[in-house]
Amino acid sequence: MPVVIRLARAGTKKRPVYHVVVADSRYPRDGRFIERLGYFNPLMPKDNADRLKIDLDKVKAWLAKGAQPSDRVARFLDAAGVKKRTARNNPEKAVPRKERKAQAEAAAKS
């Protein structure tokens, strides 16, 4: 059972609130979950302490059991100092394709 720590949307239309939950990755985003670990309210100011509340002890326990955090939850855990987030680095992204290289070389010759 692949377990993930992710955000489940709650709240009303145009006023989202997210629950930080542990769920099987095959469950729907807002569906069944195993345990609720906290909440995130994106409408609150960034400096407000109630914007994000997570039970870090429970998170550490689930990480020890093998649960994988989603990208957004990994950012939260990195900010809290629980788990270091690996930087996404794709050095091949800026390399032009072969056709573009050929066009650039042809343009440079003329």
UniProtKB/Swiss-Prot annotation:
Residues 84-110 are annotated as: Disordered. Keywords: Ribonucleoprotein, Ribosomal protein. One of its GO terms (molecular function) is structural constituent of ribosome. Signal peptide: none annotated. Residues 90-103 have a biased composition (Basic and acidic residues). GO terms for biological process: translation. It comes from the Bacteria. InterPro entries: Ribosomal_bS16, Ribosomal_bS16_dom_sf. GO terms for cellular component: cytoplasm; small ribosomal subunit. Pfam families: Ribosomal_S16. Belongs to the bacterial ribosomal protein bS16 family. This is Small ribosomal subunit protein bS16. The lineage of its organism: Bacteria, Pseudomonadati, Pseudomonadota, Alphaproteobacteria, Hyphomicrobiales. The gene is rpsP.
